[in-house]
Amino acid sequence: MSTLSFNNISTEVLSPLNQFEIRDLLSIDALGNLHISITNIGFYLTIGAFFFLVINLLSINYNRLVSNSWSISQESLYATIHSIVTSQINPRNGQIYFPFIYTLFIFILINNLIGMVPYSFASTSHFVVTFALSFTIVLGATILGFQKHGLEFFSLLVPAGCPLALLPLLVLIEFISYLARNISLGLRLAANILSGHMLLHILAGFTYNIMTSGIIFFFLGLIPLAFIIAFSGLELGIAFIQAQVFVVLTSGYIKDALDLH
């Protein structure tokens, strides 16, 4: 039994996929068949929301003349996302949807950064989270388009200057492309976070095996260790870039729904 337990532990440490496994942190059997549990993904999403509130509280100036570092950082992110939204949509309508898009950016960014902490959990590496976001956003943009334009919203599927003979084929292609937004938006975020964390896990295990093989190999292992540190910095950049790409595409989908192009 102990050997089996030892083998299970070894498999968990060496497998790069086990870090993404959803586990119950707290499980309660309530009345009847009712089962209440807190999973690691729910726990870390809650932590992300908590950090979001804390950061906003820390950025409040309380009528101080000189802004603190938290406030300056928040204002920089605010200005960046505001510029993206107003340029993608337009200055007037962009103001309406900016609070949602800014909150979406901070939510994704914080959860991406939490996933970079060792022994934590990358919530945005799970397709159930990213697809829930992407399906909701595309559905909301579609409802917005129908609410504003009615059946004229279907003109979004008709390319400008399309020959009449090719119209059925091109409309079908545009329709499939529109439906693919549900998948591509969430897939891009989860795949980038997932692949980066898997590569870091594999490189870390490889470096650990080298550095524990002897004194000579310990110094040789400093080379891949330096690469891991550099790659971790790159992953931090990817955490910001993927959050920004997500909101840029979201702004584009809202613009398509509003302007039909």
Swiss-Prot record:
Record-level GO BP terms: proton motive force-driven ATP synthesis
Main function: Mitochondrial membrane ATP synthase (F(1)F(0) ATP synthase or Complex V) produces ATP from ADP in the presence of a proton gradient across the membrane which is generated by electron transport complexes of the respiratory chain. F-type ATPases consist of two structural domains, F(1) - containing the extramembraneous catalytic core and F(0) - containing the membrane proton channel, linked together by a central stalk and a peripheral stalk. During catalysis, ATP synthesis in the catalytic domain of F(1) is coupled via a rotary mechanism of the central stalk subunits to proton translocation.
Keywords of this entry: ATP synthesis, CF(0), Hydrogen ion transport, Ion transport, Membrane, Mitochondrion, Mitochondrion inner membrane, Transmembrane, Transmembrane helix, Transport
Bilayer topology annotation: Multi-pass membrane protein
Transmembrane segments: 38-58, 96-116, 126-146, 153-173, 191-211, 214-234, 235-255
An example Gene Ontology molecular-function term: proton transmembrane transporter activity
Record note on quaternary structure: F-type ATPases have 2 components, CF(1) - the catalytic core - and CF(0) - the membrane proton channel. CF(1) has five subunits: alpha(3), beta(3), gamma(1), delta(1), epsilon(1). CF(0) has three main subunits: a, b and c.
Official protein name in the record: ATP synthase subunit a
Subcellular location: Mitochondrion inner membrane
Chief site of localization: mitochondrion
Record flagged with keyword Disulfide bond: no
Family as reported in the entry's similarity comment: Belongs to the ATPase A chain family.
Pfam families on file: ATP-synt_A
SUPFAM superfamilies hit by this protein: F1F0 ATP synthase subunit A
Coiled coil: none
Gene: atp-6
Taxonomic source organism: Neurospora crassa (strain ATCC 24698 / 74-OR23-1A / CBS 708.71 / DSM 1257 / FGSC 987)
Propeptide intervals in chain numbering: 1-14
GO cellular component, one term: proton-transporting ATP synthase complex
Keyword Glycoprotein: no
InterPro entries xrefs: ATP_synth_F0_asu (IPR000568), ATP_synth_F0_asu_AS (IPR023011), ATP_synth_F0_asu_bact/mt (IPR045083), F0_ATP_A_sf (IPR035908)
